[in-house]
Swiss-Prot record:
Entry protein name: Transcription factor AP-2-alpha
Predominant place of localization: nucleus
GO MF term set: chromatin binding; DNA binding; DNA-binding transcription activator activity, RNA polymerase II-specific; DNA-binding transcription factor activity, RNA polymerase II-specific; DNA-binding transcription repressor activity, RNA polymerase II-specific; identical protein binding; RNA polymerase II cis-regulatory region sequence-specific DNA binding; RNA polymerase II transcription regulatory region sequence-specific DNA binding
Keywords: Activator, Disease variant, DNA-binding, Isopeptide bond, Nucleus, Phosphoprotein, Transcription, Transcription regulation, Ubl conjugation
Job description of the protein: Sequence-specific DNA-binding protein that interacts with inducible viral and cellular enhancer elements to regulate transcription of selected genes. AP-2 factors bind to the consensus sequence 5'-GCCNNNGGC-3' and activate genes involved in a large spectrum of important biological functions including proper eye, face, body wall, limb and neural tube development. They also suppress a number of genes including MCAM/MUC18, C/EBP alpha and MYC. AP-2-alpha is the only AP-2 protein required for early morphogenesis of the lens vesicle.
Gene name in the database record: TFAP2A
Clinical disorder: Branchiooculofacial syndrome: A syndrome characterized by growth retardation, bilateral branchial sinus defects with hemangiomatous, scarred skin, cleft lip with or without cleft palate, pseudocleft of the upper lip, nasolacrimal duct obstruction, low set ears with posterior rotation, a malformed, asymmetrical nose with a broad bridge and flattened tip, conductive or sensorineural deafness, ocular and renal anomalies.
This protein's domain notes: The PPxY motif mediates interaction with WWOX.
């Protein structure tokens, strides 16, 4: 047994020595080839046409072109700071085109020896182009060339809209008339606007035609009356100076509120040739007179004039005021003042009597000059025909007071001079009566 064990040990020792002598020499070349493979096959630090293998990128340390500020929020308090990245003062601004090219060339020299494809990985190029757009007009003009085509529509949309003063198409027109006349210079600008030919022709039907009948607002239940509203009156409510919308016009015409009341009213107006756009805003302030149709407004003015003529206490007011000025030395002066005031009131009422503002279904020919007539027409349109008759009624009440004041002064003069001859009094009274007329 011991002999067999010693033989086995010797046999294994021989095999180990044989492997060491035979394989030891063979391992050295293999180790040499394995050790040399990563160094001999490494590419040089330059661009190679091999596109399958890209060496790892280890950028060398560099100094930033734009030094960061210590306080990242230092630019917030200063509204005139050009750039938060330019916190430190520099002799020259890096945002100009010439300097930018020199900086880009210097930046390429710092990355010399690297692959050409890696030069676009520098994130500072994007920041530099962004900074060029934030500075003055010169940098802005140079930076516009770097904008992409996709950003152009957004830049165009931000341009403020400038209206062409040559195109003057009033949006308050309520009558559908012929096509709008445009000049040659403006025809190209409006050629792209879609125009409905059906809305360009036609016009308002007979202005004297009755549009609807409206019950009065101010009448009592026992004497309720209805007023006829013509097409011309509806046109005046939709035209300046009021420019009523569908809601207010429906209130004037006493139309019941409904879900589609505005649309039905616009359709009804469209049938007679009047245009009432949706979403329209009123142009004048709403008063109590706005709710009255012209027939009721004129009726109110006529009743007001009747009350002023018959019920105004002109005589009592004249006697009361004359007693406050009973000094005989002031009577002559006061009488002349009353006569002059009466003459001025007469001139004023004569002017209002010549007013020919359109009212109801009548459109009389103007008598006054266009300047003063347009002002009176504006007043009557705002008041729905109540204005001028009401003013005339008030001035008539004033004239009645002046007449009663002159009569009272004559009585006071006769009472203060009882020795005067009756003939002289009669002659003076006749002259005064002629002057009053």
């Amino acid at each position: 047994m011991l002999w067999k064990l010693t033989d086995n040990i010797k046999y294994e020792d021989c095999e180990d020595r044989h492997d060491g002598t035979s394989n030891g020499t063979a391992r050295l070349p293999q180790l040499g080839t394995v050790g040399q493979s990563p160094y001999t096959s490494a590419p040089p630090l330059s661009h190679t046409p091999n596109a399958d293998f890209q060496p790892p990128y280890f950028p060398p340390p560099y100094q930033p072109i734009y030094p960061q500020s210590q306080d990242p929020y230092s630019h917030v308090n200063d509204p005139y700071s050009l750039n938060p990245l330019h916190a430190q003062p520099q002799p020259q601004h890096p945002g100009w085109p010439g300097q930018r090219q020199s900086q880009e060339s210097g930046l390429l020299h710092t990355h010399r020896g690297l692959p050409h494809q890696l030069s676009g990985l520098d994130p500072r190029r994007d920041y530099r182009r962004h900074e060029d757009l934030l500075h003055g007009p010169h940098a802005l003009s140079s930076g516009l060339g770097d904008l992409s085509i996709h950003s152009l529509p957004h830049a165009i949309e931000e341009v403020p809209h400038v209206e062409d003063p040559g195109i003057n198409i009033p949006d308050q027109t309520v009558i559908k008339k012929g096509p709008v006349s445009l000049s040659k210079s403006n025809s190209n600008a409006v050629s792209a606007i879609p125009i409905n030919k059906d809305n360009l022709f036609g016009g308002v039907v007979n202005p004297n035609e009755v549009f609807c009948s409206v019950p009065g607002r101010l009448s009592l239940l026992s004497s309720t009356s209805k007023y006829k509203v013509t097409v011309a009156e509806v046109q005046r409510r939709l035209s300046p100076p009021e420019c009523l919308n569908a809601s207010l016009l429906g209130g004037v015409l006493r139309r019941a509120k409904s879900k589609n009341g505005g649309r039905s009213l616009r359709e009804k107006l469209d049938k007679i040739g009047l245009n009432l756009p949706a979403g329209r805003r009123k142009a004048a302030n709403v008063t109590l007179l706005t709710s009255l149709v012209e027939g009721e407004a004129v009726h109110l003015a006529r009743d007001f004039g009747y009350v002023c003529e018959t019920e105004f206490p002109a005589k009592a007011v004249a006697e009361f005021l004359n007693r406050q000025h009973s000094d005989p030395n002031e009577q002559v002066t006061r009488k002349n003042m009353l006569l002059a005031t009466k003459q001025i009131c007469k001139e004023f009422t004569d002017l209002l009597a010549q007013d020919r503002s359109p009212l109801g279904n009548s459109r009389p020919n103007p008598i006054l000059e266009p300047g003063i007539q347009s002002c009176l027409t504006h007043f009557n349109l705002i008041s729905h025909g109540f204005g001028s008759p009401a003013v005339c009624a008030a001035v008539t009440a004033l004239q009645n007071y002046l007449t009663e004041a002159l009569k009272a002064m004559d009585k006071m003069y006769l009472s203060n001079n009882p020795n005067s001859h009756t003939d002289n009094n009669a002659k003076s009274s006749d002259k005064e009566e002629k002057h009053r007329k």
